[in-house]
Amino acid sequence: MNWILSPLKVRPDHRNRIGPKAYGLSLMAQEGFNIPDTLFLTVDAYNAFVNAAGLRERILLELNRKKFKDMRWEEIWDCATRIRHLFLKKQIPGPLKSYLTDKIQSHFNGKTLAIRSSAPDEDASGSSFAGLHESFVNVRGSSSILDHIRLVWASLWSDAALLYRQEIGLDVEKSAMAVVLQETVTGSRSGVVFSQNPNDKTQVIIESVYGLNQGLVDGMVEPDRWVLDRDKKTVLSHKPAQREHWMIPSEHGVETAPLPEDLSGRPPLNSKEALGICDLAFRAEALFKAPQDVEWTIKNDTLYVLQSRPITTLSPSETQDKRAWYLSLHRSFKNLQDLRNTIEETLIPEMTKTAKDLAEQDIMVLSDR
């Protein structure tokens, strides 16, 4: 069976079966980078589920009700919702379920997992899919792990993912999904590092938060930000965050909680640690022969790499990344809170004032010109 691969056994010809995210992690593991305990579900597992559950014909039916390019956004949203609902209604078939359960239990031995997408489409297009598919952290128990694998598979068919694939010219009907299963490393500090600042090639950017990286990635927790000189490997600036919250494991996954007072007054990293993370980014850049965006976490003073991907745009003039609009279809909770505050604190008072001013006008002296 070709449903699961371990990082150290991945070969170059496996790349289109596990996607670039998983393949990149396998290269890092083979080169001695410190990554969490990991397994990869290949696209063969996805296809086995889709075929056994009879979903392929249903997906084609939904996609061909009308020419995709002629669909309005709300029609695409309806189509995507129906397809994803099909994934969630269908159970993983017996042989595949037994195989996955046995492999996951024997390998991870009850550990909580992070379950991440790895879409082979990224290789075909040369475009970044970061943020367009689902990822889950701190998932425990065989049943819940299998449910979340289906959720990752289903996220291949979100409205944002469908629209984005159409925009960059991919054949939506041939899409498939691989999955990364990683032991959840409950880091005390986490973040991302850009080995090359997209807006200034002489700089490195580090963003860091207390707790799990999910808070930063989802936009729920404001990060501290460091700018470093690439050549001199020195810190140029540090912009502190307000440090009010962090994301931590919970019984049902993760949750945002108030940051303890003893942490709120100091940055997640010192200068020495920032330089160490800078070195990690340079190692990743040397391995992949391209500037990298690396997610990392620190647990018990050990630095782990969670994933690494190429930086797709290196200056405003080179911007080809078309994800922004599609990512905006799904706002984070913080985005929605900010929108609510803007409406309640700015827009409504302005509208009320305008209405009051109009009410005080003498309409008899108004002109229609």
Language-model features: where?
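A generic structural motif
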Residues: Q182-T184, Q196-N197
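Conserved divalent-metal-coordinating catalytic cores
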Residues: M1-E31, D37, V43-D44, V50, ...
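N-terminal beta-alpha lobe that positions the nucleotide/phosphoryl donor
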Residues: M1-V180, G187-R189, L269-K272, L280-A286
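Short beta-strand segments
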Residues: R116, Q182, E207-V209
